[in-house]
Amino acid sequence: MLAIENYLILSAILFAIGTIGVLTRRNAIVIFMCIELMLNAVNLTFIAFSRHLGNIDGQVFVFFVMTVAAAEAAVGLALMIAFFKNRESIDVEDVNLMKL
């Protein structure tokens, strides 16, 4: 069995990749995928600590995070589809051009 440090290092690397992707990309779908990667990195940390400490609290919290992430995915994709129909682009710089 791997030590908890290995899981935490992997989680930190995944979170860093997601953060870099959010900060450097302009495509809304890629940014959305990077945010999901960051959420999964946090979930990995919760699971690692849950297994290390021997309780189930982290696993239950991961279940709730995954539920919220699924709802976020549905709403986010619906907004992207509506934005694409309006502007025919999913570039985040075009969002500033929208008026209410």
UniProtKB/Swiss-Prot annotation:
It catalyses: a quinone + NADH + 5 H(+)(in) = a quinol + NAD(+) + 4 H(+)(out). One of its GO terms (molecular function) is NADH:ubiquinone reductase (non-electrogenic) activity. InterPro entries: NADH_UbQ_OxRdtase_chain4L/K (IPR001133), NUOK/Mnh_C1-like (IPR039428). GO terms for cellular component: NADH dehydrogenase complex; plasma membrane. It is found in: Cell inner membrane. Coiled coil: none annotated. It is a multi-pass membrane protein. GO terms for biological process: ATP synthesis coupled electron transport. Its EC number is 7.1.1.-. Keywords: Cell inner membrane, Cell membrane, Membrane, NAD, Quinone, Translocase, Transmembrane, Transmembrane helix, Transport, Ubiquinone. The chain crosses the membrane at residues 2-22, 29-49, 61-81. NCBIfam families: PRK05715.1-2, PRK05715.1-3, PRK05715.1-5. NDH-1 shuttles electrons from NADH, via FMN and iron-sulfur (Fe-S) centers, to quinones in the respiratory chain. The immediate electron acceptor for the enzyme in this species is believed to be ubiquinone. Couples the redox reaction to proton translocation (for every two electrons transferred, four hydrogen ions are translocated across the cytoplasmic membrane), and thus conserves the redox energy in a proton gradient. Belongs to the complex I subunit 4L family. NDH-1 is composed of 14 different subunits. Subunits NuoA, H, J, K, L, M, N constitute the membrane sector of the complex. This is NADH-quinone oxidoreductase subunit K 2.
